[in-house]
Amino acid sequence: MIHAIGTDLVELERIKSIGIDRFKDKILNEDEKNEYAKINHENRKLTYLAGRFAVKESLFKCFKAGDKTANYKDFSVLNDSVGAPYVVSKHTSDFVVHITISHTNLYAIAFVVLETKV
């Protein structure tokens, strides 16, 4: 059963204006920083950050419905062996989490569905 849904749209220019390194330190946890460190292309680093931010904001919208509290670093948004994103967090242990991330040259968007485990 669907517990909650969330979506978020991020302007890449907004992240650039804040500063990529500052933004990275604000939202990424250590596991994500390890993935991020392997990225060589600057534009890919930007879309990685924007995508992670969009997923985490989407998750916050989902948990608002369930009165859960969390911060950015409580969620690891990682990639599996074929590049599909997935979430690791103590806050999601009661749910199956479905996420998708997409981006263009200007924006990144994420959509999250929290499904109650049966």
Swiss-Prot record:
Primary location recorded for the protein, binned into one broad class: cytoplasm
Record's subcellular location: Cytoplasm
Top-level lineage group: Bacteria
GO-annotated biological processes: fatty acid biosynthetic process
Gene3D superfamilies per UniProt: 4'-phosphopantetheinyl transferase domain
Pfam family of the protein (one): ACPS
Cofactor: Mg(2+)
Cystine residue pairs: none
InterPro entries referenced in this protein's UniProt entry, alphabetically: 4-PPantetheinyl_Trfase_dom (IPR008278), 4-PPantetheinyl_Trfase_dom_sf (IPR037143), ACPS (IPR002582), Ppantetheine-prot_Trfase_dom (IPR004568)
E.C. designation(s): 2.7.8.7
Reactions that this protein is recorded to catalyse: apo-[ACP] + CoA = holo-[ACP] + adenosine 3',5'-bisphosphate + H(+)
Gene Ontology MF terms: holo-[acyl-carrier-protein] synthase activity; magnesium ion binding
Binding site for Mg(2+): 8, 57
GO cellular component, one term: cytoplasm
Keyword terms, alphabetized: Cytoplasm, Fatty acid biosynthesis, Fatty acid metabolism, Lipid biosynthesis, Lipid metabolism, Magnesium, Metal-binding, Transferase
Transmembrane parts of this sequence: none
Function: Transfers the 4'-phosphopantetheine moiety from coenzyme A to a Ser of acyl-carrier-protein.
Family the entry assigns: Belongs to the P-Pant transferase superfamily. AcpS family.
UniProt name for this protein: Holo-[acyl-carrier-protein] synthase
Species annotation: Acholeplasma laidlawii (strain PG-8A)
Lineage of origin: Bacteria, Bacillati, Mycoplasmatota, Mollicutes, Acholeplasmatales
